[in-house]
């Protein structure tokens, strides 16, 4: 069966995450509904990253197997038409033929995430579900300097969900940069894979540094404690975006 790689974007605000769930609207269920209307087949789509409820994507990757070897632009345009008809905030950006050995999840060698913070006194009126609004002034430079203590290979028990199903809490974080652009602060994270709630836990803990409640040493101590209770708050999903997957 011909295998196709799909690159897509979506606004996760009104979805219960990626993974199919009974009686809940998810990204996977919406895509599989569109795939059925297009192909007449009950197909299963596999993704690089099963994003949580409220998390967005600008460069999510998935793969699906069809019985027919469709033209890639036909797949893209037909799926987009069905998604729009369904009222879904999902768009197929690119479609590519790939070998059977390609797996959107297991072939990935690097995942890139962005976390957006709106740092101003006034709340957002337009992007309420696409940023984390923090009215208190944040020191982005202090946040960036502290974030470098998290880069590298570590036991990230402190920064993963208590419900994380990963066998090991050890991950190698390749990048965690914090940059301010006007009223917005961007956190850029890069690794082969991440733990459940890891980036949102980073964002919440770095917020503590940004407002001056924590020092860099406090963040480092929280990391080495390997204790979930030492983590700062878990930032809301609204600010998180999966931006790119490398293979």
Swiss-Prot record:
It comes from the Bacteria. GO terms for molecular function: RNA binding; tRNA pseudouridine(38-40) synthase activity. Substrate binds at residue 113. Keywords: Isomerase, tRNA processing. GO terms for biological process: tRNA pseudouridine synthesis. Gene3D superfamilies: Pseudouridine synthase I, catalytic domain, C-terminal subdomain, Pseudouridine synthase I, catalytic domain, N-terminal subdomain. Formation of pseudouridine at positions 38, 39 and 40 in the anticodon stem and loop of transfer RNAs. Homodimer. HAMAP family: TruA. Belongs to the tRNA pseudouridine synthase TruA family. This is tRNA pseudouridine synthase A.
